[in-house]
Curated annotation (Swiss-Prot):
The active site is at 243, 277. Catalyzes the NAD-dependent reduction of succinylglutamate semialdehyde into succinylglutamate. Keywords: Arginine metabolism, NAD, Oxidoreductase. The gene is astD. The lineage of its organism: Bacteria, Pseudomonadati, Pseudomonadota, Gammaproteobacteria, Enterobacterales. Pathway: Amino-acid degradation; L-arginine degradation via AST pathway; L-glutamate and succinate from L-arginine: step 4/5. CDD domains: ALDH_SGSD_AstD. Pfam families: Aldedh. Belongs to the aldehyde dehydrogenase family. AstD subfamily. The keyword Oxidoreductase applies. This is N-succinylglutamate 5-semialdehyde dehydrogenase. PROSITE patterns: ALDEHYDE_DEHYDR_CYS, ALDEHYDE_DEHYDR_GLU.
Length: 492
């Protein structure tokens, strides 16, 4: 029984699914997808649970969410192993994901009060009050790269605001989704407040088509995000938050410490085997001896990166990709770039047939025309050389995406220029592109999102504002508008 609907664990009636470790093939999870009838049942359960959940005092909802955080702490080692085994990422990185899930709770409580709390201002004859109300029933579509943390970034603020939810994890990470739901169950969520439906495209289409939905919160690829946007077109009454990917540029401009710049670049491009939406995909390096020295050192260090299994000792920097087909897709993308005229600096290698272990690849594309503006979700970095900083900014902005952009430079004036001209939601200076703070918004423009950033701003799309003019008494104004006559006729 792998679906959680209205407080009960039930067996899916859809397609049978088996999840294996992407590196060693170990069977980890078996279950069946939710069919359309079960998705509709989850919608009805969430709708029925909404009035009571929304009317609970905030402190009562907060207490349940904080109990969930405490359970995450208790089960940290267990959940770390589940995430690592299911995604292929090393144990050390899976542990940081669980820590981020725990920290998200307190941050979300603060964000709720800061972004969507209650405010009142006095007026001469009363008061103006701002309150926030939950939307109702929201669907959450989770990604596979951070199967615990990223859905958590939608679920926690949505529950705090008083919404009820239907969560569909990625079909590539059903085990993590199930494990997290069991912790929510232990935390004492009332039946129907949070429902779990497993499945792939058919389940997702049934969920996004539900009339019961008041909104949909999505993290994933631009292609799927655009499909959801089209599906919900003509329904402005439904909130849609799209957090999508990027073709992110990192500019290297005369670094003072080459090893530090190489470290930052590797953290930006290859952490999580390149499977972060903010990962650097395009490396813009200034021409000259310093740029040449930087690239030589980058190649030297990058070729030592050998992916390993989640529990290898010593622990590897990167593990496998989410699946063998995903690794093959990245490898074939490198082959296509090379066929277009790219010059391979470091060739990626599939380490073992039938597994997702792929070494990083670096290819120079300077001067190559009509390079596809695609997000290749893996450890593949293209290099572009430039002469002037203005040229680097134009190259950085030459994408339909707009998620993250970074600059490595000792010159603050260059960063100030980048801040003014960059078209991206995240613009970093001498920090990895993959670094993000939950105390700041997280999201992009263009094909990277629809202006609904998450993290600190997630509270904004989890509630709508209600404005009130209030007075405890009703009296006739001393001064009336022209044309109004409230005089009383004397009786005859």
């Amino acid at each position: 029984m792998t679906l959680w609907i209205n407080g009960d664990w039930v067996t899916g009636q859809g397609e049978r699914r088996v999840k294996t470790n992407p590196v060693n093939g170990e069977v980890l999870w078996q279950g069946s997808d939710a069919d359309a009838t079960q998705v509709a049942e989850a919608g009805r359960a969430a709708r029925a649970a909404f009035p009571t959940w929304a009317r609970l005092p905030f402190a009562a909802r907060q207490a349940i969410v904080e109990k969930f955080a405490a359970l995450l702490e208790v089960h940290k080692a267990e959940l770390t192993a589940i995430i690592a085994r299911e995604t292929g990422k090393p144990c050390w990185e899976a542990a940081t994901e669980v820590t981020a899930m725990i920290n998200k709770i307190a941050i979300s409580v603060k964000a709720y009060h800061a972004r969507t709390g209650e405010q009142q201002s006095e007026l001469p004859d009363g008061a103006a009050t701002l309150r926030h109300r939950p939307h109702g029933v929201l669907a959450v579509f989770g990604p596979y790269n951070f199967p615990g943390h990223l859905p958590n970034g939608h679920i926690v603020p949505a529950l705090l605001a008083g919404n009820t939810l239907i969560f569909k994890p990625s079909e590539l990470t059903p085990w993590t989704g199930e494990a997290v739901m069991k912790l929510w169950q232990q935390a004492g969520l009332p039946p129907g407040v949070l429902n779990l439906v497993q499945g792939g495209r058919e389940t997702g289409q049934a969920l996004s088509a539900l009339d019961a939905l008041d909104g949909l919160l999505f993290t994933g690829s631009a292609n799927t995000g655009y499909q959801l946007h089209r599906q919900l077109s003509g329904q402005p009454e439904k909130i849609l938050a799209l957090e999508m990917g990027g073709n992110n540029p990192l500019i290297i401009e005369n670094p003072e410490d080459i090893d530090a710049a190489v470290h930052l670049t590797i953290q930006s491009a290859f952490v999580t085997a390149g499977q972060r939406c903010t990962c650097a995909r395009r490396l813009l390096v200034k021409r000259g001896e310093q740029g040449d020295a930087f690239l030589a050192r980058l190649l030297e260090v990058s070729q030592r990166l050998t992916p390993g299994e989640w529990d290898d000792e010593p622990q590897p920097f990167i593990g496998g990709l989410i699946s063998e087909p995903a690794a093959r897709h990245v490898y074939e993308a490198w082959q296509r770039l090379e066929a277009m005229g790219g010059r391979t600096l470091l060739a990626p290698r599939m380490l073992k047939a039938g597994t997702s272990l792929l070494t990083p690849g670096i290819i120079e594309m300077t001067g190559v025309k009509q390079v596809p503006d695609d997000e290749v979700f893996g450890p593949l970095l293209s290099v572009w050389r430039y002469e002037r900083f203005d040229e680097a900014i134009r190259m950085a902005n030459n994408t339909r995406f707009g998620l993250s952009c970074g600059l490595v430079s000792p010159d603050r004036k260059q960063f100030d220029q980048l801040l003014l001209e960059a078209r991206a939601g995240i613009v970093n200076w001498n920090k990895p592109l993959t670094g993000a703070a939950s105390t700041a918004p997280f999201g992009g423009v263009g094909a990277s999102g629809n202006h609904r950033p998450s993290a600190w701003y997630a509270a904004d799309y989890c509630a709508w504002p209600m404005a009130s003019l209030e007075s405890p008494t009703l009296v006739l104004p001393d001064s009336l508008s022209p044309g109004l006559d409230f005089s009383r006729e004397e009786p005859v």
